Amino acid sequence: MSETEAADAESGVETYEVAVVGGGPAGLSAGLYATRLGHDTVVIDRGGGRAAMMLDTHNVIGVTEDVSGNEFLSTASQQVEEYGGDVVRDLVTDIERTDDGRFRLGGNSTDVIADRVVLGVGFSDERPEPPLPRTGKGLHYCLHCDAYMFIDESVYVMGANEAAAHVAMIMLNFTDEVDILTRGDDIEWSDETQQLVEAHPVDVIHEDIVGMNKRDDGWLESFEFEDGTVREYKGGFPMYGSNYNTDLA
């Protein structure tokens, strides 16, 4: 045993060759590869994330669409563990370089040292103000994942920025019933984008949302607006940006 290994053992700190921060698809994939390559690996996951919100899994080869996000992540975690990796539930709050060039990761209950660190921490979507339907049942953040389910359905895109306008244009490939809901915010897109919006069958609704109605199965049925109108939608996409979890980088 080297002096470093002896010191680690004496301190009681767990040591690994690879520590992966983040237990979404990216982090678990990194953990699985590292473990199968023979590296002593730990995946530290705070929980939550986009994948955990999925009611059904789409666009993943070999995974049937009746698999929920939580089931998908659970299976991936089991795969890491079956090959000898550790999966720990904790929020990593600090990473610092040690004197010998390794990394010490601290969390609410975690204290580990690793030769290498992989950050798979993802990002968090900005949620609009309520009232809102349930995520996955009328409120959707991934256009590539969920646009297909709205073929020939009434769809909203929430926001007043360039992204909202361009997502509305994309949704016209799936349905001819697309509204942009600015919720009273000032338009931020360019004059060129305004011309694009005006040239397509998209309604821009400026009144804010004051109420919401759901169907018996929990899906969104309609929004109520401050001018008294009620508009029916199957679902839609809020476009308020994302916060990338880069604090540890």
Residue locations for each model-derived region?
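Conserved N-terminal glycine-rich FAD pyrophosphate-binding loop of Rossmann-like flavoproteins
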Residues: 2-3, 9-15, 33, 46-70, ...
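Hydrophobic/aromatic ligand-binding patch that stacks against planar heteroaromatic rings
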Residues: 29, 33-34, 117, 170, ...
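A Rossmann-like FAD-binding core segment of flavoenzymes
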Residues: 80-106, 111-114, 175-249
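Rossmann-like dinucleotide/flavin-binding elements
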Residues: 10-41, 142-186
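Helix-loop-beta segment of a Rossmann-like dinucleotide-binding subdomain
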Residues: 54-69, 102-104, 152, 174-183
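FAD-binding core/adjacent interface of flavoenzyme oxidoreductases
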Residues: 2-18, 87-153, 237-239
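Glycine/Thr-rich phosphate-binding loops of Rossmann-like dinucleotide-binding domains
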Residues: 127-128, 166, 246-247
